[in-house]
A protein has these predicted regions:
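Conserved core of the PLP fold type I
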Residues: 1-129, 137-159
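Active-site PLP attachment segment
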Residues: 151-177
Length: 177
């Protein structure tokens, strides 16, 4: 199918449930050649009119991809607990791109209380979503994993994105959402 091979999507669904606590049907999973491709799909899905909040400092390539897709971006400051709620609320972002499990470049891990606050932010207004970029989350050796935003989202406001480029090999560029 255009969303990825059925067997691969089934395997990803099992992996997500077992290791990240995410319950997703294989039909809900989209496989792509790299996260850049998936970010472009997200802009097509959620719209170019929306303002995409990106972490500052953060993965600058995401902001460039959103801008190339015709979307406007807004910087959202990061502190020792990840995305600053105050900065997010002061921005005009409708969609937040965040890496709560291992923020780049700070390495901050967003605590569960702030994750719940981020979900409340998304639920507070129609058209708000969170793109959870879980890149590099498999490499947590000292701390117990905190639940992903997607696994505790009850309102369907989180789009989970990850890749196998760090765990398998960088060459295949297999990413999924």
């Amino acid at each position: 199918t255009p969303n990825g091979a059925d067997a691969l999507r089934r395997a990803i669904a099992q992996h997500l449930y077992r290791f990240r606590g995410i319950s997703a049907a294989p039909e809900q999973i989209v496989v792509g050649a790299g996260t850049e491709y998936l970010y472009n799909l997200i802009v097509q899905l959620l719209g170019r009119e929306a303002v995409y909040g990106v972490e500052d400092p953060g993965y600058s390539k995401a902001a460039r991809i959103y801008a190339l897709g015709g979307a406007r971006t807004a910087p959202v400051l990061v502190d020792e607990g990840g995305v600053s709620l105050r900065s997010l609320e002061m921005s005009d972002a409708q969609i937040l791109h965040t890496s709560p499990n291992h923020q780049f470049p700070t390495g901050a891990v967003t605590p569960i209380g702030r994750r719940q606050s981020l979900l409340r932010w998304a639920e507070a207004r129609e058209g708000r979503y969170i793109i959870e970029d879980d890149y590099d989350s498999e490499f947590r050796f000292t701390l117990r994993p905190i639940p992903t935003l997607q696994s505790i989202d009850r309102a369907g406001r989180v789009i989970y994105v990850n890749t196998f480029s760090r765990t398998l090999a960088p060459s295949p560029r297999i990413s999924y959402m």
